[in-house]
Amino acid sequence: TANMEWADYVTSMKMYNEAVANDNNWNQQIKQSVINAWSNAFDTGNYGPYNDVFPQVDWWDELVKPGFSQQYNVNISGGTNFMRYFASIGYQNDGDIYDLQKQENFDPRNYYRRYNWRSNLDFNLTKTTSLSVNIAGKMGYRNDNFADDVYTRIIAAPTNSFPIKYSDGYWGDGSTAGYNPVCNMNTNGSQLYKTFQGWYDVRLEQKLDFLTKGLKAAAKVSYTSASTTRSSIKTGEIWGNNDFESRNS
């Protein structure tokens, strides 16, 4: 995912003043004293995503990170004249592209983890009788939070209206000045989906060459199982500085 490039606040204010001046809306211009204060903050380094007075937040940089996907697989096979076997175990882990932190009572991170397995056993019970036992399955875990329209909210969030957090520990005040995506994605809860699928079959085969050459009889028993569960924790939605909007589900 490509990073976004943003103009700094001083440049934005100067461009805004130039735009309104072109329309002769002089009374809408930002005061030069405000621009000078911000310019001094940039010159002295007194600004940043956690600065109470001069917040400068690159929401994209704060939230978006490179994602990853991992896959592992192990196979074993072998056997004797009496029995042959094959077994396979796999694991897949798709990580999050958002830089979120696990909370005390829930995990808002987005991820998908899957385990899959397969085992085949073939027995030569006699010269004319064979038995096959096959087992396969997979189990998946998909976790996410309740944030929606994330990309649009990150792009639309104001970069200089409030910090991510104030020095007193409260979240930046998104209730009156916009939306705090770092706060919302980390604090509004999580939901975990668990899925399971299993396949089982047993096949018995008997050669009947004594009746007709190449004739065989076979019997097969199969069973399939599947389940899906969802567990969720939905907190109240925190919009900003000591501002709590209760929303439970």
Regions inferred by a protein language model and the residue ranges of each:
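Short, glycine/acidic-rich hinge or "gate" loops at secondary-structure transitions
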Residues: G214-K216, G236-E237
